[in-house]
């Protein structure tokens, strides 16, 4: 395999699970958490088998202190924005990394409160992403909406059926006080597995991985 091609593929492909130098996929708890992006995902896109996964089965209070939530998100992002090695294997490189969504659309009702506006400004700074807003009454079915990788549905109205035909993930969760849940409304997790052996001989990976 060409190291140049592998590195280019790693940097440019948009998928939830990436595999290099191996003939099959994998889905192993913690080592290779599994879950797709785009149409192969729904909700906040938390991967099955990841350290975040048990959190999705709990109920959380809606946000009451935006400042506290912003501080918690900043602290969590400072840790989870780095490549995190999922095991100590020498024969495989298994790691996970969180990537901010490039563009997020917020669908809400009229006149969101000032605290929410302040929160969105903080989110843009923390994750360096583009966040657009639109009122539910002005939302239209056209291809321009497909430029977003995630739509955050905060309107009291139900999402229309046509919205599911597009490539983005649809997140209908309310803003909650828990940062480990809330972060997945702004980022998505990628799991990467690279075989580092050839017929049992260690060190035959086509890609050099730096864990920061």
Residue ranges of predicted features:
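Conserved C-terminal structural/oligomerization subdomain of aldehyde/semialdehyde dehydrogenase
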Residues: 1-212
